[in-house]
Amino acid sequence: MLKNIINKKNLFINNQQNIFQIIKRNKMTDSTVDNKGYIVGIYENEEFTPLGQQLNEKTNGHLLKSIKLSDTKGKVGDNLVLYNVTPEVSRVAIVGLGKKENNNSTTYEKNENTRKAIGSGVKALKSKNATHLTIDSNIGDAKQTAEGAFLSNFKFDFKTGTSGKTANSTNESIQVQLSPSPSSEECFKEGKILAESQNFARVLMETPANLLTPTNFVQHVSSQMKELIDSGKVEMIVREEQWVKDQKMGMFWGVAKGSDEPLKFLELHYRGASADGKDSIVYVGKGITFDSGGISIKPSANMGLMKGDMGGAATAVSAMFGVASLGLKVNLITITPLCENMPSGKATKPGDILTAANGKTVEVDNTDAEGRLILGDALHYACSFKPTHIIDIATLTGAIDVALGQHYAGCFTTTDSLWDQLNECGNISGERLWRMPLIPEYRKQMETSKVADLINSAGRSGGACCAAGFLKEFITADQSWSHLDIAGVMSSSEDGPYIRKGMTGKPTRTLIEFAKKNQQ
């Protein structure tokens, strides 16, 4: 039974990229009037986008009359579905675009408004069984249009349908065209790949821990990237326990040994700029496939969410998928240490001392502060490539959620130029970052052990900052490095216009944008 569920899950992952198809105008297949839907925009001044204006004129003002009779005022997020607008158009979703001329809008606001408008329209039409959608290309940039459409169509569960068979998703195959066809069709394709990449991260993060062990994680990545690996575009290297011991990664092994599930150390290499792989960017993702807290066990309430504690690893490998699929001229390496954090007779205990790969000793005060342990060894290894930048991504601390909530990820770096780039990429993608302090005083809080060089937990005060200070101990001098604490943005507690309640897959698109910005 378990094997059948896993096989169905692999089939879902393979099909996830094919939810949408880009098709030319008037070339939709198997379409009927009953399954067609149109998405048009309206501004707060009651002005339609061109396709909406055409439909309004063709129906003697029916669209505008309907708007005036409704609560829809053209604000971003508003939507109204009309039926039987013309004999050829069975459904029209009118989506609010806000003010038409707003010179004060930032890049973030403009891009987000497009994603929100498209996402609300797709969800509204999909709920009415429309599967062949025509979107007015004048609503916004083609790239953000594709992102809003693909991301909003994502849904993942194991519920049984009327047939009694378990399904991983209720997603239907939806065909999308833009009207009029944009000159920048490549932008739409790029947005599609960006959204598919994030959706893959969401699949990994949503999958329950019994179906996503470290071994399963590697299998899913191998399946997702099969074409890229087979074609030689991506090299996949899977390290086992003995290699970790040979590398003297005592912190990683100290966490992994508490579980019966074997650890994995996954490396992916993409050489899009040069065959020698020089001047690479390295993404390091925390890969705790389930975090019970270990001997310092977590409270039972909401522990199930800790299936997503490998969100850093999920977004790192998903970014690799996007970068390689886009064929960006950049060299990229992803490193993901994968294991579970479990209590057992073999598990590390509070008070134990571990020796890191760089030779430093660490007193384990709290086994639930395990992410920084596996990341420390992985970061030391990442430095051996002498990359241009190292970015680690981790659901590291509850403290960052308390500080920033679900709307910003915390960014720690001492390199101003790196922060500027990441901040710009976050504004483009809509996955916002907030710079947090990384000063020596926080590191000193991690040096309070009487028996070791470092302690892995310094208490409540400045928790996220102290964790970042701990990680910095494993970065070589003068190495450009940033730590992204994504614990707050790991999941969304409510449905949004284009991101549903659940695991978000953030900041996958930001990582892809960063690689794009650093092409050689």
Swiss-Prot record:
Pfam families on file: Peptidase_M17, Peptidase_M17_N
KW Hydrolase (keyword) present: yes
Residue sites binding Zn(2+) 1 per the record: D291, D368, E370
Residue numbers annotated as active site: K298, R372
Annotated keywords: Aminopeptidase, Cytoplasm, Hydrolase, Metal-binding, Protease, Zinc
Cellular compartment(s): Cytoplasm
Highest taxon above the source species: Eukaryota
E.C. no: 3.4.11.1, 3.4.11.5
Gene Ontology cellular component terms for the protein in this record: cytoplasm
Record flagged with keyword Transmembrane: no
Catalyzed reactions: Release of an N-terminal amino acid, Xaa-|-Yaa-, in which Xaa is preferably Leu, but may be other amino acids including Pro although not Arg or Lys, and Yaa may be Pro. Amino acid amides and methyl esters are also readily hydrolyzed, but rates on arylamides are exceedingly low; Release of N-terminal proline from a peptide
Cofactor or coenzyme needed: Zn(2+)
Cofactor note: Binds 2 Zn(2+) ions per subunit.
GO biological process, one term: proteolysis
Gene Ontology MF term list: manganese ion binding; metalloaminopeptidase activity; peptidase activity
Residues involved in Zn(2+) 2 binding: K286, D291, D309, E370
Matches recorded under HAMAP family: Cytosol_peptidase_M17
Its job: Presumably involved in the processing and regular turnover of intracellular proteins. Catalyzes the removal of unsubstituted N-terminal amino acids from various peptides.
UniProt record similarity statement: Belongs to the peptidase M17 family.
Subunit comment: Homohexamer.
Protein name in the entry: Cytosol aminopeptidase
Organism ancestry: Eukaryota, Amoebozoa, Evosea, Eumycetozoa, Dictyostelia
